[in-house]
Amino acid sequence: MATQAKRRRVAGPAGSDDDPAPVASFLSWCQRVGLELSPKVAVSRQGTVAGYGMVARESVQPGELLFAVPRAALLSQHTCSISGVLERERGALQSQSGWVPLLLALLHEMQAPASPWSPYFALWPELGRLQHPMFWPEEERRRLLQGTGVPEAVEKDLVNIRSEYYSIVLPFMDAHPDLFSPRVRSLELYRQLVALVMAYSFQEPLEEEEDEKEPNSPLMVPAADILNHLANHNANLEYSPTCLRMVAIQPIPKGHEIFNTYGQMANWQLIHMYGFAEPYPDNTNDTADIQMVTVREAALQGTKVEAERLLLYERWDFLCKLEMVGEEGAFVIGREEVLTEEELATTLKVLCMPAEEFRAFKDQNGWEDDKSEEDSLTITDIPKLKASWRQLLRDSVLLTLQTYATDLKTEQDLLSNKEVYAALSWREQQALQVRYGQKMILHRLLELTR
């Protein structure tokens, strides 16, 4: 979930409030809590791609410290003023997301007049103007993002948020009326804070020897979450026992913005979790999904008699047993690689192999004496696949393209006409970038399977 700084990468419908008071108050707070900002950087709305950001006052070299945040200044379930009660009752706060303790900490601190983090909250985006698709009208979300996987992800989020709020959060607030004012007892506010945590929180990575532990709880990191995102980022967050340090990893010329990144995120993930998409072709981490059940559907289209259909379902059940496929899984295709290489190669192989060969393969529980080159599957390998594999993959791509409301040419026409594109709403532009990036990957697969 949340791992690195989260902020819109491209200019959106943010407010144009240039009031210097929040920044001055925040900088004074930084001094009080020991948050060390390099004199070479400035917090500003000027010269940034979206909202508040950080800009280089002077040239910065790789390895230079941009700022250091002492752990005491982090806002988490462990540092907030109600940490004691959150710890005592942590058993009742268990949830699927794992975010409830932090969200309760935020609900308490944001309504407390004397909260130590008040100057930090002043730099938060306006909660009522968050651009996540969960805040779009359902009809608009489905119309603009049909086929991308986002509407389905949002629906799951909304169900989980509602359940979490009424079964865990509200009962906790009702049990502690002295800690939570009536104005923060709102499902809508809770949804907004979930989106904020999704987009702005950090999650400290586990050490190698801790791999089997539960993931660390999310936390809010003042200053670090001011940075905007760019795939080709020029700064990186480092964790140490006493503080979190943002360090330059590329030369940053004077006047240029400082960017963090939050990993390899496809555009559909960006818009779902953070409310923006990178314009094509900037997002080199973009992907397109082919639902696993779509490949099964494509294979079923090639069956002619009941016996063939029954055998195909037997093959599918065997793939499920091998944990190569699942009813809700997807094969993930990037611009230059198949991210689910083993799963896709094995699925094409099992669904396309002759019946006798499948029987032998099944008897060996999917083990073979020799792993063939066919078991690897890269983008460049696709034209070399067996004809039956290519055909099944092609049919699956065609079925996937049918799930979108528009075709690639429609998207290209919108993107190629600057006046028409500029006239689109912010949401229409972001959704278009998501759809177009996915369709470009899928159409390349059509070329490779021709």
From Swiss-Prot:
Localization of this protein = Nucleus
According to the entry, every stretch annotated as the SET domain falls at: 39-263
Positions carrying N6-methylated lysine are 40, 156, 349
The entry marks the following residues as binding S-adenosyl-L-methionine, namely 50-52, 200, 228-229, 274
Q: Chief localization class?
A: nucleus
| Catalytic activity field | L-lysyl-[protein] + S-adenosyl-L-methionine = N(6)-methyl-L-lysyl-[protein] + S-adenosyl-L-homocysteine + H(+); L-lysyl(8)-[histone H2AZ] + S-adenosyl-L-methionine = N(6)-methyl-L-lysyl(8)-[histone H2AZ] + S-adenosyl-L-homocysteine + H(+)
Q: How is it modified after translation?
A: Automethylated.
* Entries under Pfam families matching the protein: Rubis-subs-bind, SET
Q: Which is one Gene Ontology cellular component term of this protein?
A: nucleus
The first-level EC class reads transferase
UniProt-listed Gene3D superfamilies: Rubisco LSMT, substrate-binding domain, set domain protein methyltransferase, domain 1
- Which InterPro entries does its entry note? N-lys_methylase_SETD6, Rubisco_LSMT_subst-bd, Rubisco_LSMT_subst-bd_sf, SET_dom, SET_dom_sf, SETD3_SETD6_MTase, SETD6_SET
Biased composition (Basic residues) is annotated at: 1-10
The Gene Ontology terms for molecular function here are: protein-lysine N-methyltransferase activity; S-adenosyl-L-methionine binding
In terms of domain of life, where is this protein from?
Eukaryota
Membrane-spanning ranges:
none
Q: Name one GO biological process term.
A: negative regulation of NF-kappaB transcription factor activity
So where does substrate get bound?
Answer: 99, 201, 203
EC number from the UniProt entry = 2.1.1.-
Which residue ranges are recorded for the region named Disordered? 1-20
Keywords (alphabetical) are: Methylation, Methyltransferase, Nucleus, S-adenosyl-L-methionine, Transferase
Protein family membership: Belongs to the class V-like SAM-binding methyltransferase superfamily. Histone-lysine methyltransferase family. SETD6 subfamily.
- SUBUNIT field: Monomer, homodimer and homotrimer; these structures are stabilized in the presence of S-adenosyl-L-methionine (SAM).
What is the purpose of this protein? Protein-lysine N-methyltransferase. Monomethylates 'Lys-310' of the RELA subunit of NF-kappa-B complex, leading to down-regulation of NF-kappa-B transcription factor activity. Monomethylates 'Lys-8' of H2AZ (H2AZK8me1). Required for the maintenance of embryonic stem cell self-renewal. Methylates PAK4.
The protein's name is N-lysine methyltransferase SETD6
This chain is encoded by the gene named SETD6
